[in-house]
């Protein structure tokens, strides 16, 4: 039989436990419902590893760009009175899905996984628990060539990064393709760069609201991959964006890459071409815009694919443009003038940046075989990827990447075309961008990612592909059910720590003394760190010879031989005319001679 004292103790304990549950419940609800400048939002707690992360998915940050707002800059939101239920991802922005390899995980993983809609301007926030105070914020911008992409892909899930590094992770949707980048420069109804202005408005939202989530608006790092990295570097160049963030991470992309920004004339020509295809050729811009706004978005999607010739690969149909507003000049010019945000940057590339593009139409390439191509197929590939380059220019590439090496291996042409595309489009522009930054005394860090994921569904010959460092940045190998190796989990934790340290302190080494310290990148020695499942190593001057070819030699070849094809055509036409004249003269002379001989016999 229990004593009276024991009963009292049990009652006290039960009351204490009840009070603890109630307080805990109240505290949890307080953390899950946050008051933003536009109204309250409700998130949800997610179990992550041995703890919890609170996720807010699908928070609106702009008015839906529908009807008369199509093609315009994003508009500020009005307030709402109810609690916004931010517990599932929102719509993805309209885009053409990749249908090249139906059902294949390697391509399907990048396709949108939520409904497509023009009502797509939403963002996501992951915060560690308990809710932090003044935590560093990392804002992710997805890639996709400015034509595709969505923040809801599993590979962009911010929960592991938030949990392990106790940072706040934010991602946003932005408009892509013609709906995001159609441009009639100078016309406020279709200014161009709408997708970039979407991103910029999301950055403003973070500045106004992130403190309510426990974040520090004065410690905000942008990070992105491919066109997302191109976007990040454009924010570094844009005076309007510069006050909205602190640091920047560029993964396999930069704004000075040949695909990143197009000229005003090219942007307008593509707009008028799309208008023609879609039946909106009108007498003036006002009528064109009115017609385009009345078209079904699916019709716009189908026709925007036709704007660039189908035999041209690695092209951006609609992308960033120098509008005099978001972007005041071409990135190369702004870099030369030093007109960019003075801050710290972390930049890097993957070992085999080119292979991801080869299986989408390069002659002789396939994901289903070893793609051992011939010299002729290599030359045909150069024609496709360098459509405006003279034959002399293409021969210079062939000589430098193949003939000069005297490589006798069967795979030499395959590997050479991978290197050509990777160096020209990704690696050398990224190195040039980093060099220009560091020359003005800004701290820069460069990495070379060389680990091929054990879960990669693409064939072995494609190597360490474009885009496949992202899963390690976001901590996917920490999910035990996915069967990554232990070494890959360690690599992922290391990369997350480097990224978070950089975001917090401007230095990936953080405040700890690691066994291998990541040195700053200087224009003189160009030190960089390898990231792999073994041990990181420091080297200097990544692909320096190849990048000198692209930055110094190749432009001179184009300058000297750019008109040779045209000159040759003119010469051939002239020769043909001369040859015809000569044949005509010869016929007339023969006729004259025969008549003369006839006359002589009379």
Swiss-Prot record:
Which residues carry a glycan? 85, 134, 269, 284, 369, 483, 509, 513-514
Q: Which GO terms describe its cellular component?
A: extracellular space; plasma membrane
Pfam families reported for this sequence: AChE_tetra, COesterase
Q: Which InterPro entries match?
A: AB_hydrolase_fold, AChE-related_enzymes, AChE_tetra, CarbesteraseB, Carboxylesterase_B_AS, Carboxylesterase_B_CS, Cholinesterase
Question: Which EC numbers characterise this protein's activity in its record?
Answer: 3.1.1.8
* Single GO BP term: acetylcholine catabolic process
Taken from the UniProt record, the cysteine pairs bridged by disulfide bonds within this chain are: 93-120, 280-291, 428-547
Q: Which residues form the signal peptide?
A: 1-28
Where does this one sit in the cell? Answer: Secreted
**Active site (UniProt):** 226 (acyl-ester intermediate), 353 (charge relay system), 466 (charge relay system)
Report which superkingdom the organism of origin falls in.
Answer: Eukaryota
Which residues are listed for substrate binding in this entry?
144-145
Q: Any idea which residues bear Phosphoserine here?
A: 226
Q: Could you say which enzyme class this protein belongs to? A: hydrolase
Give me the reactions it catalyses.
Answer: an acylcholine + H2O = a carboxylate + choline + H(+)
Q: MF terms per GO, please?
A: acetylcholinesterase activity; cholinesterase activity
Q: Which SUPFAM superfamilies does the record associate with it? A: alpha/beta-Hydrolases
Keyword terms, alphabetized: Disulfide bond, Glycoprotein, Hydrolase, Phosphoprotein, Secreted, Serine esterase, Signal
Self-association and partners: Homotetramer; disulfide-linked. Dimer of dimers.
Q: What does this protein do?
A: Esterase with broad substrate specificity. Contributes to the inactivation of the neurotransmitter acetylcholine. Can degrade neurotoxic organophosphate esters.
- Similarity field: Belongs to the type-B carboxylesterase/lipase family.
Record protein name field? Cholinesterase
């Amino acid at each position: 039989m229990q004593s009276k004292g024991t009963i009292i103790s049990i009652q006290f304990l039960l009351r204490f436990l009840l009070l603890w549950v109630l307080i805990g419940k109240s505290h949890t609800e307080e953390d899950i419902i946050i008051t933003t400048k536009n109204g309250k939002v409700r998130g949800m707690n997610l179990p992550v590893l041995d703890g919890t992360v609170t996720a807010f998915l699908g928070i609106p940050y702009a008015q839906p760009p529908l009807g008369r707002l199509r093609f315009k800059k994003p508009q500020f939101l009005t307030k709402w009175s109810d609690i916004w239920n931010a517990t599932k991802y929102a719509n993805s922005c309209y885009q053409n899905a990749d249908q090249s390899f139906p059902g294949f995980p390697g391509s399907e993983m990048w396709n949108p996984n939520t409904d497509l809609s023009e009502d797509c301007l939403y963002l996501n926030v992951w915060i560690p628990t308990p809710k932090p105070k003044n935590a560093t914020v990392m804002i992710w911008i997805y890639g996709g060539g400015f034509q595709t992409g969505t923040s809801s892909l599993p590979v962009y899930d911010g929960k592991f990064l938030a949990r392990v590094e106790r940072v706040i992770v934010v991602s946003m949707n932005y408009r892509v393709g013609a709906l995001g980048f159609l441009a009639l420069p100078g016309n406020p109804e279709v200014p161009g760069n709408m997708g970039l202005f979407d991103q910029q408005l999301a950055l403003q939202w973070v500045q106004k609201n992130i403190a309510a989530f426990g974040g520090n608006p004065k410690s905000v790092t942008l990070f992105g991959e491919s066109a997302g990295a191109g976007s990040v570097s454009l924010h570094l160049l844009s005076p309007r964006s510069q006050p909205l963030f602190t640091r920047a991470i560029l993964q396999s992309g930069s704004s000075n890459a040949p695909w990143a920004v197009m000229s005003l004339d090219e942007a307008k020509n593509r707009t008028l071409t799309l208008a023609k295809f879609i039946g909106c050729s009108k007498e003036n811009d006002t009528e064109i815009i009115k017609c385009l706004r009345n078209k079904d978005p699916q019709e716009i999607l189908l026709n925007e694919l036709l704007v660039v010739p189908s035999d041209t690969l690695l092209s951006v149909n609609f992308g960033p443009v120098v509008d005099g507003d978001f972007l005041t000049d071409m990135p190369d010019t702004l870099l030369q003038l030093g007109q960019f945000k003075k801050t710290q940057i972390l930049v890097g590339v993957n070992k085999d940046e080119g292979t991801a593009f080869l299986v989408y139409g390069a002659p002789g390439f396939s994901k289903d075989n070893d793609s051992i191509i011939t010299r002729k197929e290599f030359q045909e590939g150069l024609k496709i990827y360098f459509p405006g380059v003279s034959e002399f220019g293409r021969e210079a590439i062939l000589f430098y990447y193949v003939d000069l090496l005297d490589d006798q291996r069967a795979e030499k042409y395959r590997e050479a075309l991978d290197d050509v595309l990777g160096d020209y489009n990704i690696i050398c522009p990224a190195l040039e961008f980093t060099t220009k930054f560091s020359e003005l005394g800004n701290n820069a860090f460069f990495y070379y990612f060389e680990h091929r994921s054990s879960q990669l569904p693409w064939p072995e010959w494609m190597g360490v592909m474009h885009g496949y460092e992202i899963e390690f940045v976001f901590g996917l190998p920490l999910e035990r059910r996915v069967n990554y190796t232990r070494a890959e989990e360690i690599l992922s934790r290391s990369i997350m720590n480097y990224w978070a340290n950089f975001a917090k302190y401007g230095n990936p080494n953080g405040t700890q003394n690691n066994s291998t310290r990541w040195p700053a990148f200087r224009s003189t020695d160009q030190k960089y760190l390898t990231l792999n499942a073994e041990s990181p190593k420091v080297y200097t001057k990544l692909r320096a010879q190849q990048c000198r070819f692209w930055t110094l030699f190749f432009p001179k070849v184009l300058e000297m031989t750019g008109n040779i094809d045209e000159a040759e055509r003119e010469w051939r036409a002239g020769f043909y005319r001369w040859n015809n004249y000569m044949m005509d003269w010869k016929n007339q002379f023969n006729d004259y001679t025969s008549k003369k001989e006839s006359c002589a016999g009379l």
